[in-house]
Each structure stands twice: as C-alpha cells, then as structure tokens.
Amino acid sequence: MACQLDLLIGVIFMASPVLVISPCSSDGRIAFFRGCNLTQIPWILNTTTERLLLSFNYISMVVATSFPLLERLQLLELGTQYANLTIGPGAFRNLPNLRILDLGQSQIEVLNRDAFQGLPHLLELRLFSCGLSSAVLSDGYFRNLYSLARLDLSGNQIHSLRLHSSFRELNSLSDVNFAFNQIFTICEDELEPLQGKTLSFFGLKLTKLFSRVSVGWETCRNPFRGVRLETLDLSENGWTVDITRNFSNIIQGSQISSLILKHHIMGPGFGFQNIRDPDQSTFASLARSSVLQLDLSHGFIFSLNPRLFGTLKDLKMLNLAFNKINKIGENAFYGLDSLQVLNLSYNLLGELYNSNFYGLPRVAYVDLQRNHIGIIQDQTFRLLKTLQTLDLRDNALKAIGFIPSIQMVLLGGNKLVHLPHIHFTANFLELSENRLENLSDLYFLLRVPQLQFLILNQNRLSSCKAAHTPSENPSLEQLFLTENMLQLAWETGLCWDVFQGLSRLQILYLSNNYLNFLPPGIFNDLVALRMLSLSANKLTVLSPGSLPANLEILDISRNQLLCPDPALFSSLRVLDITHNEFVCNCELSTFISWLNQTNVTLFGSPADVYCMYPNSLLGGSLYNISTEDCDEEEAMRSLKFSLFILCTVTLTLFLVITLVVIKFRGICFLCYKTIQKLVFKDKVWSLEPGAYRYDAYFCFSSKDFEWAQNALLKHLDAHYSSRNRLRLCFEERDFIPGENHISNIQAAVWGSRKTVCLVSRHFLKDGWCLEAFRYAQSRSLSDLKSILIVVVVGSLSQYQLMRHETIRGFLQKQQYLRWPEDLQDVGWFLDKLSGCILKEEKGKKRSSSIQLRTIATIS
C-alpha cells in the first residue's frame, strides 16, 4: 500500500501544471527546461528542486557527474531526446530520493548495466520506445531497485521475456508493460523470477504472442505458474479459437482476476463460415483461475454457443461488445452463477426470446445498446430477478410490453410512438430520442411508482387532445423534457396541469420547446424545485410570480428577453441569462445596475450578455454600458407619473373650462369686469395729462350716428355717463358750426390721441369720412406712430374693403377691428377698443443716417 501511495504522489507531481514557470528556468521546486536545445544537464539547479523536466532536448550523455547532488528531486523527465542517448554507470546516483524516472521515446544507444544503481526509492521507470533489446531483461539492469512498482518497457525491440534472477528482489513490482514488442512465445522458465508475486497489471498487448509461430504447448507449459495477476492484457494479438483454448489449457490454475482479449479474430463474422465461433471447450480450462472479468470485445463472434461460459462460476463481468453476435444459443450463459454485468452492446441482435438469458441468477446490469432489436418477448427480462439496469438504447423497438420492474431502464433512441399503459416500477427511466407525441404518455409516465428520474429529451411531445387527471407523483426528483414541442400543446389552453402533484421535483429541463409564454401557474405545485432550464426558447418576458418560489438555479439563456425585471432573479443562487436579445434603453438600466451589483452567480462570459438594439450598441456587453444618463430619469419616474396624472387632469379641466368660457364668454367677461372693479374700487382712473384735448376722434358717416351712439358712444364717452372714462370727439357734437369742415376734421384728428374710423357701407360712400381717414393716415406718417384705429362694421368683405384705394393701403400694413356678430362679445370688444385708444404708441426715431446731396437743376 505504501508503494502505491508513493506512486500516486509521483503521478500527481508529474501531472501538476507547470504553466506558471517561465520556459528554461527554475523556481526552486520545478526546473522547466523542455525544448531548450540543451546538450547536457544544466548545473544551475537549486538543491531544493523536486521536479526536473528535460524532455525535447539534445542531451546525448548522462553519467555519474552529470547531476549535482539533488536530494529532494522526485521526478526526472529525460524522454524524447533528439540525440541518441548514452547512459553510464551510476548515472543517477546523485538523485537518491528519485521517485519517477522517465526516459521514454529516447533512443538509448548505450545503457550501462549499472545505470540504475543508487536509486533505492525509485517507484516508476519509463523506458517505452527506447529501442531496447531483450538484454535489458536478461542482464540484470534492474538490480537493487527494491521500491520499483511500475516498469514500462512497451514499444521496444524485446523478443524474449527471459528475466534475470534479480527480478526476485523486486518485491514491490506490481505493474509491468511489454506491449507493442514482438514476443512470439512465453514459456514457464522465462518468468520464473516472478513466481510468488502478485501483479496488478501485466501487459502483452499487440505482441503477436502465440499467433506467428508454431507453439509446443506441452513443452512450453504455464508461463504464469505461481504468479497472481489482477489484470492480464492479451488484446490485439490476433488470437483464434484454437489459440485461446490452448492458452487457457496451459495457464489453468493460475489466478487471473481480469483477462483482456480485446480485438481477437474468434468467430466468422456476418456472412462467413470459415472461422469457428468459440464453444464450450474454449474457456473450459479457466475454471480454476478465478476469472472475475473477461473482455472479449471487438471481435467477430456471430453466435453464442450453448454453455459457452459454463465453467466460469466466479465470473462477474463479461464484455462481448463490438462483435457480430446475431444469435444467442440455448443456455449460452448457463453456469454464470456470479455474473453481475453483461455487455452485449454494438452487435447484430434483432430479437430476444424468453430463454436467451437463462442461467444468470445474479445479473444486475445488461447492456444491449446499439443492436438492431425490434421485438422482445414479454418474459425475457422478468425472469432476471436481480436485474437493476437494462440498457436498450439505439435499437428499433416499437413497444415496451417487456419492461420489468427494475431500478433503471434506458430506452433512448428507439422508435416508440405510443406507450401502452402497463404496470411497472422504475427509479430511472430514459426515453429520449423516440417519437412520442401525445402528452397522455407523459401523464402515464409521471404516475410510474417509485420513479425518481425521467428523461424524455428529443421526442415530439406536442399534442394534448383531452383533459387529463393530474399526476400525483411524490417521488419524482428530476424531469428532462428538452427538445420537444410543448408550445404547440400549451397554446391550445390544455395540459397546463402537467406538473401538478410533483411536490418533490427538484430539477426540470424545458429547453428547446419553442415556448413563447409560460402558462399561468404552471409551476405552482413545484415547491421543491431548485433548478429550472428554459434555455433556447422564444420567451420575451417573464411575468412576476411565474417562477417557483424556492428556485435556486435558472437557465434562461438563448431566449428573446428584452427588458427582464431583476426582481425575478433576486432569490436565485445561480443564473444563466446569456445570448438574449436585450433592448438597451433606459428601461433596462435597473437590470444593468443589478448585473453589476448582484451576488447571484452568473454563468457565461460578460461578452455573451449583449445588446441587440439599438444598432449603435449592437453586440456591446451590458457590463460596459453606462446608465448615468438614466439615473435622473429613474429617480424622477414616480414624479413623472404623478405629473402625467396632474397634467391629464389639468388639461381636461382646461378643456372643460375653455368650452364653458367659449359658450358663455359674455357672462364670463362681465364677471371679470365686476371682479376687476371690486379689486380696484379704491383707485381712481386718471389719464396722464398731455397735449391732447380728446382721447379719440370717432369718425363715422352721419347715417350711422344712431347706431354709433347706441353701440359705442353711450358706453365709452364720459359725457354720456360718469362711469365712462374716455373723452371722445365726434362731428355731431364737437365740430364748430360755421367753421370750415376741413378745419374741423384737421383739429379733431390732431387734437385727439387716436382716430377711430367706423368703416361701414355709408362710410365708404362719404367723402368727408374718407378725407378724415386720409388726415389720420397723414398724422400717423408725421408722428411715426399708429394713431388710426379701423373698426369694420357690418358685413363688408375683404374684397369690398380692398376696392377703395384709401383703405387698401392701411389694410395691407395694419391690423383692424371688426364689430362682433354675437351680442355677448360686445362688452369684450368695447373693452379692447378702449385699451387700443388708451395704449401709448412710441414714435420711431427718424433716421439721421440718410445723407442728402444737392441735385443739380436743369435750367
């Protein structure tokens, strides 16, 4: 046990990564000089060096002085030298604690007989593919290697296994490999120094043993007499039935736990009869060898003959995989009372009968995958009372009436379209890669008693034609439904209760089911669910409450999630959300912030969590996107909503008030004026004193006097009422009788702050009115300010107004007032007219930048 532990430690030392060491350097413990073009052992080594790696160099000589004293060195790698190697006597004596010496794939031109002396603690010696001859075994090269446990001499030029007597001293030797040599025979006297030893492995793979020469079996006798072998590897030697039988005869009585005869040529194969299949006598002599494992895989056996293994009472594992077995003879397995594992995979079996497996009272595992089995009799496996695992994957089965009540049934890769509702129990049921379509089969399987693991990947589950009774299965722990078409079933509104009653389910796979939504409450009963895979579907959104409450691991990768809510993932321990189609706008800022702050373990590379929109951010990692511009918007989101409500209400009220005001504008204006008078009741209206006698000269046709007096003058002129505030001038009252009419007009225009022309049909026909209009325009030009106010009265159109040249010039440049048609607007109009009269107009300064020049006169 101590030797095996030391060997394990040595292997660990060798396999440890050296990537942290710079090439052609040493860190004190590891000296890494692989491929450094060295021609000799470097002397710059530290005495603390434990591993020295010198492969792939040009070192051609190793002698006693090649190494400094390295008492801690445990691994020396000198393999694959590009120069022929000469190893002198005591070449490694300065490495007293060496555990592993690797010289493999170096062409050793000279190997001194004392080359390995001084290595009392050596556990493993690798001399594979070194060009060594049989002399390395017969001349005592391995003397005094008392700790040697593993010797690898594979791939050399050894033709004889005649061992030197010093092998008797190698009490720790347990693993010897002579594979890939040309050793045509082995006889009893050659391995005599190994008698009394127990070897864990003895390799003779591809040595052409007994297959190229005529062997005197009686004189050669048992080469393994007195040797106990745990594993004897005789594969790829081209053994026929006769060679196998003769070898079994000469080694009878030798204890061999595992016999490997892979890649043999026993059996005719399919369609041939020139080579015999093994029969009852082939392995009969192994009865006293206590063989526990027999590997006959990769051959050409076509038929398993009756009682073929009848004498192998102790056999526990039989491997017949990769043959051409098409027929199992009657009682072919008779006598295998202890067999536990039977491997018949990768053969040509087409049907199985009730009698095929008679004689296997303790078999627990039967592997029949990758045959062509299309039909099985109902009682074929039910007679195997201890059967625990039945592997029938990748066959052509269309029915499962034969299923026994066992722990594990593997039926993936068959042609099952419908499952008969038979009664059976199982712990593990695998039915992937079949042709199941109706979810009624899923409901049936979920009711199988004691079922803990159910695999239905890569079927066609898509149909749900009727309501089903929910499955009550308190034992199911893992359910795999990857690569089906559940979307087609669920979009009809049926089978939403398929997971109801699965109270102990812990793992659920729903990947690749074309799901674009999750039915409401689909996971409500999965109170124990810890892991859920929804990857590779078409989900765009996950609704709050759609995930199980106790979920810890969620795979939602390769969907079409746009803006997921991070609150859904806050209770998870592990999350895979890679390869989705994220829309990178401010709505995603909360999720981006969560990604950078969460304690949830996120699977995948950050580069796999990327934007799909907008195009400016296409392919950019969410981890690299700044959300600073969105912080203010996020903080103001609730305020914005409140403002939205406020604005909506305000706008509605405004529209209502506007409609009311428009409808009852006259009343509203009167109320406004009343309030204004109440507010300013203590203030006396006073006009700024100035040079004007009147506030306004009202010019109108005498034919319009009655209307003007009733509509305007009584409401504006202070002489009519003390409540009026304007001093008005008009012809009928204020013109001086007998005075020149032009003078009166001129005095009225120039003596008033503003001139108001009431343009009506009579006005346009009255010459004096038009003359007063021209005087007012003349004053406007003189004072460089607008003192003319035009009020259009009646139904005069724009065309009628523009016909008069005097009026046209004003209307093209100035605004005018029109007497309201609705009586409720009269008050507002009078107020506006008063405001226009009282409004002070600032005159424009005359430009002084215009230079005048004298124009020559022509006489």
UniProtKB/Swiss-Prot annotation:
Pfam families: LRR_1, LRR_8, TIR. Highly expressed in liver. Detected in lung and at very low levels in most other tissues. Residues 27-641 are extracellular. It is found in: Membrane. Changing residue 609 to M: In strain: MOLF/Ei. Disruption phenotype: Deficient mice exhibit a markedly altered enteric microbiota composition, with increased levels of fecal flagellin. The modification Phosphotyrosine is found at residue 799. GO terms for cellular component: membrane. Glycans are attached at residues 37, 46, 84, 246, 343, 438, 596, 599, 624. The keyword Transferase does not apply. The keyword Transmembrane helix applies. LRR repeats lie at residues 45-69, 72-94, 96-118, 121-144, 147-167, 172-193, 198-212, 215-230, 235-236, 261-285, 290-302, 314-335, 338-356, 386-402, 413-432, 450-471, 475-496, 504-525, 528-547, 550-568. GO terms for biological process: inflammatory response; innate immune response; positive regulation of cytokine production; regulation of tumor necrosis factor production; toll-like receptor signaling pathway. Changing residue 619 to A: In strain: MOLF/Ei. Keywords: Disulfide bond, Glycoprotein, Immunity, Inflammatory response, Innate immunity, Leucine-rich repeat, Membrane, Phosphoprotein, Receptor, Repeat, Signal, Transmembrane, Transmembrane helix. The chain crosses the membrane at residues 642-662. GO terms for molecular function: transmembrane signaling receptor activity. Residues 663-859 are cytoplasmic. Residues 692-837 form the TIR domain. Changing residue 482 to A: In strain: MOLF/Ei. Belongs to the Toll-like receptor family. Homodimer. Interacts with MYD88 (via TIR domain). Interacts with TICAM1 (via TIR domain). Interacts with UNC93B1; this interaction is essential for proper TLR5 localization to the plasma membrane. This is Toll-like receptor 5. It comes from Mus musculus.
